[in-house]
Design a protein with these regions (language model features):
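Active-site histidine-acidic residue metal-binding/catalytic motifs
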Residues: 95, 252, 274, 308-446, ...
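Extended surface/linker regions that mediate inter-domain or inter-protein docking
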Residues: 215-364, 370-371, 647, 786
Length: 999
């Protein structure tokens, strides 16, 4: 009987004697030494289900059979075995995505092969399923520390770190001095430098009465003072926005502006300042409209789903039925899914889009199940109200509208079933012909366009003055072509209309030429409507009595009206045109375009005729299958829809936020779902042209859970899907969520996370250096109110945080990356901190909070493909002197100055910023126009606040470095200022390493 062993079980298994190696190595060698290596490092990619390179290492037979490259194991010949080739070298190919085997592990495998590669035939290796981040979360016991270090234990954090250091033969560095701690806390918690007065006040308070160290009570008071500052939310919101890819433009080719993205940014700032519980913060960003109806933050938080890049061309200009359109929408949902799981759970679920995850236990079914959670939402401007009563009413009406939309979809499905194959074939024929009716070339001057109306039964007219009476032979109407709302050919052509002629502009005693007011006239597409007459007239009027539908409104539009005389000459061209009303939007729409001799003509006139015929057949069939009961039901639903729209229209206009939305104004091919989820299928190799089974809304499998699927009723709404996901993520027993956020907060205080890959807690990521500390922090945060401020307080009051950043030669030789935290990490200020600090010390910083972002560029061609011209911007503009978190962030053309200083790239998630040191940074800090303008402002401030040059220098050092100047600085800076001027000295002072680095 064969046995199957996991790594945990086979270590203790007893293997059959005689099947193992002989005395050297002994019979337990494979079981105890080699099998754990193969199971822990290799079997995940080389197993029966997923044999990477054609090689499985689960059994002796499969391992010795080899793979695509030949014999991976040549018995007795390690140097001829491909297996070892992949495991050795400076950069071993295997294990892929994981740390290489140690020299000792490679040696053990080599010994095993050399000794005969014996493997018990009844021993099967399985994937080790005990990855650290997947394990249930519980509070570890706080370790004890040696008596010599007990005085340094201020918080449980210290005990965990000191115990780990002691294991390595190291210890904490001495505590930092008061000035260093004040500056460190101000920047970490607010992102701004302390003023000279703040530095002096708090340094004095922090200094113990006997000058023996730091006054702990005063230190805690400073921490609480900074956490209560509104500047705190601005600082910590910036970290969050880095991760979620926030920007004020869409990215991709056209990089359109998002005028209403900023309310989400302000929501994040406000949430941090309010110390909102983390579970609530998460739930608002995924399903706030469903879980907290009527509350503005429930809408504002949904800006998270819309924060990332968006393909304008792929959604607006390309139909959803085209491959590029399908790809755009698939990738858009991919971004929503990956951003959600990367941010909140540190899971790289996007790796399962084209195939099952290579390293983590997630399948394509899980991935596309998550896509289906977001299948009804798009990124768009949506209305919200600060008045909770109005917001609740609006959300109630939107929910009603979604319900009606669902019933209309069901009605359409009923009609489709009743029409059978004939209806389906006609619709397919019409869809195929529609693309052939595009105009031969786009005409920018479309024609005449009436004002927009909320209902169809409104009269609109347009008339032509021929200047004098003329005997007529024919009147020809040419339809428009416009892709707005996906309409295309026949845009705005009236459903019911008439043509009249008269001798006077008042149309007294008018004569009727054509009357199409008794029935609905089919859309002529790009065909013409011709009316013959032998009457004489000076004025010709076309009157629409039933307007053409757009999206939730109605219009009357014509591209051209030709009027032919008896000699077949168009006498209307260039005539005077008047109308009941007109939108007059040159060059696109205006009255004069109606008689300019230009109109769209189809590439395939025969296709137009076929399409008109097919539509007539479709209309006839629909009249047959739409029974009186069905007609009555449709009209009731349409009336209900109109009532809801009218009630929504009567509500206050509200404010706008760019967020996840199911209701918004259509733009070209970009249309709202109305709350009805799109069909999402598992895609073979991620190919939109190869759909497989329909995806079922789900989460991800976790240990101890029987299923990842949500328990949703059959009549659930799209918001129910998002609510289920939000609840799953914030469940108390979720092992990933609480570890993820604790790791992020730790990282921003120490400039390095406990788990080195904050967005990836899977097997491709790095395990934590202090796993028990991470678990303790996660449980403490989760169980003590989920308060960010409490977690900050716990971390920054620890001795680990309060130690100096001074170098220790011996410890650095042992732990050069400081992963065991034997000192505080020194870091360069982030780009926003540098810019804000320069504004602060120069006296130019405007602390106004919230509102639309300010430009650091000149904006050109905003309506098509915006150009963001940074070199044309004047940095002396006071509107740009606010904190950097409020700047307008562009994806495709980021600010060169901020990018040089390693600012986050908003086109991708930035869980940890790079810190580089380049010549370009030095050049920018010295010569960028912003630096020059601020140096002048800094000099003016010094001259206004200090009289003598020595006092100005000392004041400048206090402002930039938070200390008094020394004798050498006063002497050398005075000499420099006398030779080159105070402004040039200020340029130098703003480039000091001590100014831009934090100890």
């Amino acid at each position: 009987m064969n046995r199957t062993f996991s790594l945990a079980t086979f270590i203790s298994a007893v293997c059959c004697s005689g099947l193992l190696l002989g005395a050297e190595p002994n019979e337990n060698f494979f079981r105890e030494q080699v099998a754990p290596i193969l199971a822990g490092k290799c079997v995940r990619c080389h197993n029966d289900a997923q044999a990477g390179g054609g090689l499985s290492l689960t059994t002796a037979r499969e391992a010795l059979s080899g793979g695509d490259s030949g014999e991976s194991i040549v018995v007795g010949q390690p140097d001829s075995s491909f297996l070892l080739d992949y495991l050795v070298g400076e950069k071993p190919e295997m294990p892929k995505g994981s740390p290489p085997l140690s020299a000792n592990e490679v040696s053990l495998v080599r010994q095993w092969i050399a000794a005969g590669a014996k493997w018990p035939h009844d021993l099967t290796l399985e994937v080790k399923d005990d990855w650290w981040s997947q394990q249930s979360l519980s509070r570890p016991a706080v370790p004890s520390v040696p008596a010599a270090f007990q005085a340094s234990v201020r918080t449980p954090i210290d005990a965990f770190v000191i115990a780990k250091l002691d294991e390595q033969g190291m210890h904490l560095s001495p505590p930092a001095d008061a000035r260093t701690l004040v500056r460190r806390l101000f920047y970490d918690l607010t992102g701004l430098p302390p003023t000279p007065q703040e530095m002096q006040t708090w340094t004095e308070k922090l200094t113990a009465p006997d000058s023996s160290g730091i006054n702990d009570e005063a230190y805690t008071q400073l921490v609480d003072h900074l956490l209560a500052s509104p500047r705190y939310g601005e600082r910590w919101a910036r970290h969050w926005l880095d991760v979620v890819k926030y920007a004020d433009t869409c990215g991709y080719d056209k990089d359109k502006l998002r005028h209403h993205a900023w309310p989400y940014r302000d929501y994040v700032i406000r949430s941090f300042n309010q110390d909102k519980p983390y579970a609530r913060f998460v739930q608002e960003q995924i399903a706030g409209d469903a879980l907290f109806p009527g509350e503005p933050d429930g809408i504002l938080g949904l800006g998270f789903i819309a924060a990332g890049p968006w393909d304008f061309i792929g959604h607006v200009e390309v139909p959803a039925t085209k491959i590029d359109g399908k790809n755009a929408r698939n990738l858009d949902r991919d971004e929503m899914v990956s951003n959600t799981l990367n941010t909140f759970c540190s899971v790289t679920i996007q790796c399962a889009r084209c195939h099952d995850h290579k390293f983590d236990p997630y399948t394509q079914q899980h991935y596309y199940g998550l896509q289906s959670v977001f299948a009804a939402v798009d990124r768009a401007d949506r209305v919200f109200d600060l008045d909770p009563a109005v917001e609740q009413k609006r959300q109630s009406l939107v929910a009603e509208k979604q319900n009606v939309a669902s019933q209309l979809v069901a009605w359409q499905q009923e009609i489709q079933a009743a029409g059978g194959n004939q209806l389906a074939k006609l619709r397919q024929q019409i869809s195929a012909l529609h693309g052939k009716t595009r105009p031969e070339l786009e005409v920018p001057e479309h024609g005449y366009h009436s004002q927009i109306e909320p209902v169809a039964h409104v009269e609109k007219w347009v008339q032509i003055n021929l200047d004098h009476p003329i005997e007529l032979s024919k009147i020809v109407l040419h339809p428009c072509y416009d892709d707005f709302a996906g309409i295309g050919a026949g845009f705005g052509f009236p459903i019911r209309f008439k043509i009249e002629i008269a001798a006077n502009p008042q149309f007294e005693n008018a004569q009727l030429v054509v009357d199409e007011t008794g029935h609905d006239f089919p859309n002529p597409l790009l065909g013409t409507y011709q009316a013959e007459t032998r009457l004489t007239a000076q004025f010709i009027r076309v009157t629409a009595t039933k307007l053409a539908p757009r999206k939730n409104d109605f219009i009357f539009a014509l591209s051209e009206v030709e009027v032919f005389d008896a000699s077949n000459r168009n006498v209307a061209q260039g005539s005077v045109v008047t109308s009941h009303d007109s939108i007059e939007a040159p060059n696109r729409w205006r009255r004069s375009n109606l008689v300019d001799g230009r109109w769209p003509q189809s590439l395939d006139p025969a296709a137009v005729e076929q399409l008109v015929s097919a539509r007539a057949q479709l209309a006839k069939l629909e009249r047959q299958i739409e029974t009186p009961e069905r007609t009555s039901r449709r009209k009731q639903l349409e009336a209900e829809q109109q009532r809801i729209d009218q009630e929504l229209g009567r509500l206050p206009s509200g404010q706008m936020v760019y967020a996840a939305a199911t209701q918004f104004s259509a733009q070209g091919n970009f249309k709202p779902t109305g709350g009805v989820p799109r069909d999402v299928h598992v895609l073979h190799r991620g190919n939109v042209t190869s759909p497989l089974e329909e995806a079922i809304p789900c989460a991800l499998p976790l240990p101890g859970q029987e299923t990842a699927q949500f328990s949703l009723p059959s009549d659930h709404t799209e918001a129910d899907r998002r609510a289920a996901l939000a609840r799953w993520i914030t469940a108390k027993d979720h092992p990933l969520t609480w570890r993820s956020i604790a790791n992020r907060v730790w990282q921003y205080h120490f400039d390095q996370p406990l788990a080195g890959t904050p967005n990836d807690f899977g097997r491709m990521g790095q395990p934590p250096t202090h796993p028990q500390l991470l678990d303790w922090l996660a449980v403490e945060f989760r169980d003590q109110g989920q308060s960010f401020k409490a977690l900050h307080r716990l971390i920054v009051t620890s001795s680990v945080y309060r130690q100096t950043s001074q170098h220790n030669e011996a410890f650095a030789a042992q732990d050069g990356s400081n992963q065991y935290l034997w000192r505080m990490n020194r870091r360069r200020l982030e780009a926003e901190e540098i810019r804000d600090s320069i504004l602060s010390v120069s006296g130019q910083l405007d602390l106004k909070m919230g509102g639309p972002g300010y430009y650091l560029f000149a904006l050109e061609k905003a309506e098509h493909s915006p150009h963001y011209e940074y070199h044309k911007f004047d940095p002396s503009d006071p509107a740009s002197h606010r904190r950097s978190i409020y700047r307008f962030i562009v994806r495709s053309q980021p600010d060169p100055y901020m990018t040089t200083l390693d600012c986050a790239d908003s086109s991708q998630s930035t869980p940890k910023r790079d810190e580089t040191l380049t010549a370009l940074q030095a050049l920018s800090m010295l010569n960028n126009p912003f630096q020059l303008v601020m140096a002048e402002a800094f000099a003016q401030r010094l001259e206004s606040e200090a009289n003598t040059l020595d006092d100005q220098i000392d004041h400048a050092i206090w402002l930039t470095l938070g200390r008094s100047s020394n004798e050498t600085e006063r002497r050398e800076y005075a000499t420099f200022a006398q030779q080159h001027g105070l402004v040039q000295l200020c340029r130098v002072l703003l480039n000091q390493s001590e100014f831009v680095y934090l100890d």
